[in-house]
């Protein structure tokens, strides 16, 4: 019997509601954690009497924690109800921020930062929501992921200035408490997320009908037959494409990790005061709000590899402007726009992972790539701080990051699409026959 998997005419496809929730999540994470923690850098450095390298260490260790945990978290997301991970991660991140405000030693600060705080944001935010979006969209995957990750930039525009006001007027400890309460307010929203369209009797992209029943996969998800040719994690790991994608994401993320933690100190080094530096951080985020959805939309229509390669080269140009510009407003605006291209294509290249390897094991495969990405970028923030401590300048670090962008573009450009294995349903039937 043929079953129609459809939604009522005129109703918004539920996948777009999930994208909206994911965007809100990313806005909170981006404004309070990814971008927001650059505001904590100097106050923590001063209060705990640390060097810049030591202050950078928690950020680098959090990437080590992310590297070690990413494949496991990805497996859990693929294996169990994603809402379990979303709720657990949100609770850990919110409580972690509150606990951070209670630390009065460097050791405790380290333990809280790399423990509940970083793990919560890893497990319950970006990794989980992008996996869900990969299941809900196929033709519009690039745009959907771009909108979700644009939330980080929106957080930089809307939430980051509020964090700046809180840190400057209330102190970093009270800012951390308020941030934790905001994170906990996300709990009702994440409960509305569903793991796949098939779980609600729908199809990816809101397609109106299907000529055949969906089939269950090993992990209880139900991709449509048109999306049936999927890589398992083991099959993906055996392809050169996987390793090239891992190399690209590692190289691309080194400059991002090294620059964003130090962005406010970098801009102060260029001659700005703290309020002006916070303004330009917000401007960088605003540029990403425009650039990321545009590159996502373009990636669904043109080569994702070409768009990603061009984007990281523009990011490299932005770092050259920052390194050798004189701190004039036009140079900082140009840096904000160009560097945003290097970050903005991230959504396109994660969508490429889904295009190449399919939906069923996306979270686990992405987790493995994230592991290598995190290992590669782990030393970046400490290296940036070490360079400044030694030379009283960030120029040497910025040039190294420019060099990282070049091979990243080349690797992405050359990545081949692997030959996909037999469909899962065929493999399953063969295994059944063999037994």
Language model features by range: what are they?
Residues 69-81, 291-303, 388-389:
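Helix-to-loop junctions at the C-terminal end of transmembrane segments
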Residues 44-45, 76-77, 158, 162-170, ...:
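Interfacial helix-cap and linker-helix signal at transmembrane-aqueous boundaries
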Residues 114-150, 358:
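Cytoplasmic helix-loop-helix junction between adjacent transmembrane helices
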Residues 33-41, 234-290:
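Extracytoplasmic gate region of multi-pass secondary transporters
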Residues 256, 276, 282-352:
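C-terminal transmembrane helical hairpin of 12-TM major facilitator-type secondary transporters
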């Amino acid at each position: 019997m043929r079953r129609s998997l459809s939604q009522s005419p005129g109703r918004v496809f539920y996948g777009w509601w999930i994208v909206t929730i994911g965007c809100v999540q990313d806005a909170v994470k981006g404004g309070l954690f990814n971008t927001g923690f650059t505001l904590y850098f100097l106050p923590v450095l001063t209060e705990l009497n640390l060097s810049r390298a030591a202050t950078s260490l928690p950020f680098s260790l959090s990437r080590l924690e992310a590297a070690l945990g990413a494949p496991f978290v990805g497996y859990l997301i693929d294996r169990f109800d994603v809402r379990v991970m979303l709720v657990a991660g949100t609770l850990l991140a919110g409580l972690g921020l509150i606990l951070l405000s209670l630390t009065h030693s460097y050791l405790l600060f380290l333990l809280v930062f790399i423990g509940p705080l970083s793990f919560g944001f890893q497990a319950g935010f970006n990794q989980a929501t992008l996996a869900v979006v990969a299941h809900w969209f196929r033709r519009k995957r690039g745009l959907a992921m771009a909108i979700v990750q644009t939330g980080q930039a929106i957080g930089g525009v809307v939430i980051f200035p509020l964090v700046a006001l809180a840190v400057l007027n209330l102190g970093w400890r009270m800012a951390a408490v308020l941030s934790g309460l905001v994170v906990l307010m996300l709990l009702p929203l994440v409960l509305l997320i569903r793991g796949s369209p098939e779980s609600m009797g729908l199809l990816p992209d809101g397609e109106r009908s299907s000529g055949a029943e969906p089939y269950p996969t090993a992990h209880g998800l139900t991709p449509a037959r048109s999306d049936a040719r999927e890589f398992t994690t083991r099959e993906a790991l055996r392809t050169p494409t996987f390793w090239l994608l891992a190399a690209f994401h590692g190289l691309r993320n080194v400059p991002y990790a090294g620059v964003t933690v130090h962005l406010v100190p970098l801009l102060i080094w260029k001659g700005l005061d703290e309020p002006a530096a916070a303004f330009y951080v917000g401007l960088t985020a605003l540029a990403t709000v425009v650039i990321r959805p545009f590159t996502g939309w373009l990636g669904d229509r043109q080569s994702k590899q070409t768009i990603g390669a061009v984007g990281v080269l523009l990011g490299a140009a932005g770092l050259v402007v920052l390194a050798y510009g004189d701190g004039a407003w036009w140079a900082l605006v140009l840096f904000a726009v160009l560097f945003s291209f290097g970050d903005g294509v991230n959504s396109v290249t994660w969508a490429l992972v889904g295009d190449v390897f399919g939906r069923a094991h996306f979270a686990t495969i992405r987790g493995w790539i994230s592991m290598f990405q995190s290992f590669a970028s782990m030393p970046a923030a400490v290296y940036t701080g070490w360079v400044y401590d030694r030379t009283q300048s960030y120029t040497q670090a910025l040039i190294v990051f420019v060099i990282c962008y070049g091979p990243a573009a080349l690797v992405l450009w050359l990545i081949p699409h692997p030959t996909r294995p037999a469909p899962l349903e065929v493999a399953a039937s063969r295994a059944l026959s063999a037994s």
